[in-house]
């Protein structure tokens, strides 16, 4: 199958397709297809690269525009600057989650600066690199099982299982408690989307509350008996007498788990699928381990795990010849920017040795992903080991994407080995 083959015609629109179509808000760019959004993005980038939809939301598809907005501190990630203000309805289950510290990704300086500085002390590149032997051991165990069984679901068995175990070990979550975490993460991450059913909304809120309750108990245990794990390190971290409050610590740990699990799972699944559709690139990487870093960077660019992120101007801003009104939402379509021909040569082609593949999948600026180093490490080991261990890897069935518009990933990816 070629990179452009997507046998999903005549499929009933999924929530993700409805959200995407509604967000774009105009059929002049063609019918939005969540399984293959690139033609729509290409037309937007050519015909209306700075596009304001009927709801007043501005969508950006060019790399230069997206990068400029993400790097500009006048564009906030906090809904506090929205005009009109965004207020939850009295019966919205998400109101049960209010009252604590907002997630780090939705904070502005100086709160963001303070928390990021504290958290970074427990999340250094050196501490992540120390995980390499353990990640390799976990991947080898999963692939041993696949060899015995003659195949695996790359999403469920590798993408789903690996980051859960790694993050749980990093945080110090006991082995017996881990099975429930993956389900909580999947349910809670849906809260990033709109167009949720009442059941999805309730499950997401319950999962977030369960996360918070679990970690409150774990914090209490680590205060009494610290261990060599990240929770203990975060409890102990201090900067000029400043420490993390309980609600800040809880918010950070839950975010680390959800972001670290979901994005890595999507990187492994999307990346493997891209390689299966590009056998010459898979072979090139398989025979050259020196391409590990470059290949994963290219997979992040080609079909990244995070599709978009939003910002709100805190004042009227003129940027790249366009006026962004204060308080009106701006959406940077990271997936579209990562295939901008003004930035990348032949962007629809997967090239694991691409010499300049700096991409936006981990955002930019002050909100650059704190766990990027861990995701890259897991992606390099998981996907690199998979294609080297099983040179005859083949699709067992055509996969489908999950109904999640912000985080882009496959429901499953069944392969034979």
Give, region by region, the residue ranges found by the protein language model.
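Cytochrome P450
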Residues: 1-417
